[in-house]
């Protein structure tokens, strides 16, 4: 994920009954047979669901998820000045939908969601969770599916001020159980237990003390949690919908995804890649070699994509290549980012939806071009 700026001083969603006794038990027994039995007993909701390599809607029709990331909820709270960076109103959701978007990736901060490690009371715990739930509801009311993705976390008493290399064993399992309990009755939301791994495929799957990684700024070693545990925890907490599992190398490498796919008794996994210009895998030949085979087995989404990962270009040549390849392979995508930052990552210049740069203008035009014109006389 690109760096973010600092700032100076349709479904019914259940608000979480935080850390019930059963959820605590889920975390403690995440790898046990009890979890597997509980997950197997769950029945998929009649909303977004996976069949083979496709995502289907509640009517059984294939859905290609096309949209944007909405950054802010991962950093504003821990920086101490808000929950969102920009509005979260109904009007702002309507502006997103006006681009013919059907998918928004909403990003989470572990400390803010769990209410730990000294986050300001106004931006943590129940207030933070309810703000996310309310925003997701507004998006749904405008026909937009969502992905709820944990991306900023930290072990122990360290604050989640960045995106480290892997989820932490201290808090992430509790976070996953809480996310699942909150959204288990929302059939139009995908859950994503992690954003951009910086560990190898075995460590991403299994976690553990032998997979310790370092936090980007303070460099402490910490015990990691793996994607198999994430699937176990979410299923045992009652969530039966799709779970998006990233590739390695900042989610840019899917070459080992199928070999290290977590076991899901409900068979509701989505593969997630992040693709930017200047990434190691950012060419059609690389996509054909490493991503197309995955897309033939499970649904694939470019959970983040943009012109360049370092905001060095406001153009559209790379993003055009990425989206055309994705649409030719029934792969979804979410462009980075629906925010008004003063750099080339910003898709918009204001939250009414005015595009910024050639990059934003291209995406708006491209999505509009995918909408079939009405028949004559309609």
Region spans (language model):
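Aromatic-lined substrate-binding rim segments of carbohydrate-active enzymes
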Residues: 85-154, 172, 223, 234-235, ...
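Extracellular glycoside hydrolase catalytic/binding regions
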Residues: 47, 85, 109, 163-190, ...
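Polybasic, low-complexity, intrinsically disordered segments
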Residues: 31-44, 378
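N-terminal carbohydrate-binding accessory modules
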Residues: 39-103, 122, 366-369
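Structured catalytic cores of enzymes that bind and process phosphorylated ligands/cofactors
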Residues: 45, 51, 131, 135, ...
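Bacterial N-terminal signal peptides
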Residues: 21-33
